[in-house]
Regions:
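N-terminal glycine-rich FAD/FM-binding segment characteristic of electron-transfer flavoproteins
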Residues: 1-150
């Protein structure tokens, strides 16, 4: 699991307690504070060598940086999956959810956004995964966070 942000040590510690998590990669830097897509995409690409699948929630942020990750890795993105059939086959809704498509990828690395409501939440338990702090800093200098308003 990758945790990136600013002053997010407590998030990394909580992630380490999730069932099934064996290692948490943790990066704490102001460059990741506002989740600028260019910075996060470069970070994910740079730490992806040891992984065959890269998953993110199909949220506004995930839908912003995951296409960039796929492009940097020169693979297709598999969007909004609702089911995993096998290591290379997934189901996803199409036509506004009126049909379900089965998608198979032959890419060696899978870049996937996940429809989180389609899966059960991960249980937190007595698990204590290794937390590995990285010094990976990527400021692409392409975009700048100005402000957030409601």
């Amino acid at each position: 699991m990758l945790v990136a942000g600013s002053e997010c040590n407590s998030v990394a510690e909580e992630a380490a307690t999730c069932e099934g998590v064996t290692k948490v990669l943790y990066v704490d830097s102001k460059e990741y504070e506002n989740f600028l897509a260019e910075n996060i995409a470069n970070l994910i690409k740079n730490v992806s060598d040891d992984y065959s699948s890269i998953l993110a929630p199909a949220t506004t942020n995930g839908k912003n940086y995951m296409p960039r990750v796929a492009a940097l890795l020169d693979v297709a993105q598999i969007s909004d999956i609702s089911s995993v059939e096998s290591e290379d086959t997934f189901q996803r809704p199409i036509y506004a959810g009126n049909c379900i498509a089965t998608v198979q990828s032959s890419d060696s690395k899978k870049v996937i956004t996940v429809r989180t409501t389609a899966f059960d939440a991960v249980a937190k338990g007595s698990n204590s995964a290794e937390i590995l702090k990285l010094e990976e800093v990527n400021d692409a200098g392409i975009s700048e966070f100005i402000k957030e308003e409601l």
